[in-house]
Amino acid sequence: MGIGISLCMIVKDEAGSLQRCLNAVRDVVDEIIVVDTGSVDDTTEIARLHGAVVIRTEWNGNFSEARNLSLAAATKPWILVLDADEVWVQTPQMKTELMRLLAASRDDVWGYWIQVTSLLGVSGEEHVTDAVCRLFRNDPRIAFQGRIHEEIASSIMALAPQGVLHSGFEVIHYGYLEQVITDKNKGARNMQLIRFALNQEGDQPELLYALAAEWFQQAKYDEALRLLQPLLAQLKPECGYHSDLVLKTAYAWREIGSPERALAVVEAWAPVYEDFRDLLELGAVLELDQGREDVALNWLKQAKSAASTASRYTSVSGAGTYRSLTLEGMAYERASRWAEAEAAYTAALVLQPGSMAAWQRLLLLAAATGRPHAIASVAARVSLPPAAWQALIPTALAAHRPDWLLRHAAALAGPLRAQPLAAGLALAQLGEDAAARAALQPWAAQRSMGQRRPWRCGRWATSSPAGATPERRLASRQRCPPRPTPPRRCCCAGPRPAAAAWRAARPAAQRQAARPRLRRAACSRLRKRSPA
């Protein structure tokens, strides 16, 4: 490329992801330095095929030492640091913008913040964003610090306090996807490294916070609070992970059954972090817990009005936008303000058609109020994903609204094939007994279904509770209002406040099954984001 960038990496057994990473930067960097800490797969061969200089070293449990070994081998004036499970995002203007940025850099500019977007869940249906210094000058005075959760920004700021600027570049991180975490056993590895570091270096605040975050990740909130509380009293907002510390402390109190103490933490620090959308959403969740819908709506109004601060805080996707709108809809529901709840869910889906929390709440609301046009309105405005259409089927059948299925027959063709019983049940609800029997007959022949089960399903489908009017359904809905329970584990900025909405619309069995997907990025704030 000719603008002088060395890519520096440390790897171990990354044959499954290294090729993807290196392909994305082949037009960005001029040399590749790979420090291998003991791979037994094809990692080093893949690196050499891409022209990398491969340095083998023994792993001693210190990430910074391995990182600094790669920096020492770099020969170009600028250094880009990536992990094998990350991909540099290419855009049509990226190459030109990168060349312009580095060529125009003043002498007092030593590095740039890069947005790291970490995908979560099974396939990245949610994500967290973080700003990390990954592009910086090649200078022997600049070095990584920290045995675990290593960072380089402190080293740069010691030379120039304002020496790291924001850039418009992005890296996608795949390391927090469920399968990757399982395969790498990251939790056990991190706990071992943290304990070793504490034995070697003593009770450093960064290490204590890292340990607290690991306890938090394991849902051991009492253990986490024993570390979080003293740290919150000791540390100042200037430290790179203080906002995470506040959020995790509040959530830990809530999870052990002390919502009042959780709310006290949020109220104490919200004036300091008045643009931290995730914290403001947590305030709303806590107020909803107490049945104070109007106060919750005020928190959400503030979250929605806060400017985007992806460069300041680690934040979960949808904070201040569709997540806040979904929580807003839930607050309106609990206040029996149905039209406003419908409008909030619709607005959330316009912003994010894949928001299953908003969609499922809207389906339930439409069923309870007898307003199917709400579903048609959304379907006409946005392109809903297949999972959304699939969720419509059980809701329509449970609400005895087979007309919903007929209205959206074209969009439901695929989901109905995936749920073959649904068509028979819908026909039974429509009174088409012969057609329903024909649709359900193949299931009667399946031994696993039992001889009478399809007909029991058919009787359920055609039954209708006496007097099941919209008013009766709404009264029942008010007796069991949705509780926005947050996920039990954390992301980069701590647990996901508005993922409460995501969980509230799901059956308990599904929530239990889904718990392993709640992601970790627990100590990413230790990588020193920009203070402004």
Give residue spans per PLM region.
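N-proximal low-complexity "stem/linker" segments adjacent to membrane-targeting elements
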Residues: M1-A24
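Short beta-strand/loop segment that forms part of the nucleotide-sugar
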Residues: M9, V25, D30-G38, I55, ...
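A conserved acidic beta->alpha catalytic loop
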Residues: A24, D36-R48, W59
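Catalytic-site signature of metal-activated, phosphate-bearing donor transferases
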Residues: S64-L71, W88-E223
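Short aromatic/hydrophobic "clamp" motif used to bind/position activated sugar donors
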Residues: I79
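Single-residue signature of alpha-solenoid repeat helices
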Residues: N190, A224, A262, A296, ...
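Residue at a conserved register position within TPR or TPR-like alpha-solenoid repeats
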Residues: W215, W253, E287, Y332, ...
